[in-house]
Amino acid sequence: MAKYTNDELLEAFGEMTLVELSEFVKAFEEKFDVEAAAPVAAVAAVAGAAAPAEEEKDEFDVILSAVGDKKIQVIKAVRAITSLGLAEAKALVDGAPKAVLEKAKKEDAEKAKAQLEEAGASVELK
């Protein structure tokens, strides 16, 4: 039986499509009676245990609390931030308090908050 190096195997896998790789993984699991997802679950459990030690959030929801006097500017800001159409952005603004962005990176959330506040809206980061 020929022995392949890791580099040769990686090169071969790199030439396969995702469907072919998926079929390979299934065949490998059946042949060796293993499950590819098991190590990932263990790593996720370890990562989950370490997460409470971190106090700083890295994902934020940008909540439009109140529109203020400059509704048109707020709608324009919402459209620029979210790429929504005019009707969708107006509905979002009219429905305040509502989330403009969900699970946004800290810098993106702060930038969106600044844009909305500049347009005259009241904004919260959660």
Curated annotation (Swiss-Prot):
<dbReference type="InterPro" id="IPR013823">
    <property type="entry name" value="Ribosomal_bL12_C"/>
</dbReference>
<dbReference type="Pfam" id="PF00542">
    <property type="entry name" value="Ribosomal_L12"/>
</dbReference>
<dbReference type="InterPro" id="IPR036235">
    <property type="entry name" value="Ribosomal_bL12_oligo_N_sf"/>
</dbReference>
<keyword id="KW-0689">Ribosomal protein</keyword>
<keyword id="KW-0687">Ribonucleoprotein</keyword>
<comment type="function">
    <text>Forms part of the ribosomal stalk which helps the ribosome interact with GTP-bound translation factors. Is thus essential for accurate translation.</text>
</comment>
<comment type="similarity">
    <text>Belongs to the bacterial ribosomal protein bL12 family.</text>
</comment>
<dbReference type="InterPro" id="IPR008932">
    <property type="entry name" value="Ribosomal_bL12_oligo"/>
</dbReference>
<dbReference type="GO" id="GO:0003735">
    <property type="term" value="F:structural constituent of ribosome"/>
</dbReference>
<comment type="subunit">
    <text>Homodimer. Part of the ribosomal stalk of the 50S ribosomal subunit. Forms a multimeric L10(L12)X complex, where L10 forms an elongated spine to which 2 to 4 L12 dimers bind in a sequential fashion. Binds GTP-bound translation factors.</text>
</comment>
<dbReference type="Pfam" id="PF16320">
    <property type="entry name" value="Ribosomal_L12_N"/>
</dbReference>
<protein>
    <recommendedName>
        <fullName>Large ribosomal subunit protein bL12</fullName>
    </recommendedName>
</protein>
<dbReference type="InterPro" id="IPR014719">
    <property type="entry name" value="Ribosomal_bL12_C/ClpS-like"/>
</dbReference>
<dbReference type="GO" id="GO:0006412">
    <property type="term" value="P:translation"/>
</dbReference>
<dbReference type="GO" id="GO:0003729">
    <property type="term" value="F:mRNA binding"/>
</dbReference>
<dbReference type="GO" id="GO:0022625">
    <property type="term" value="C:cytosolic large ribosomal subunit"/>
</dbReference>
<dbReference type="InterPro" id="IPR000206">
    <property type="entry name" value="Ribosomal_bL12"/>
</dbReference>
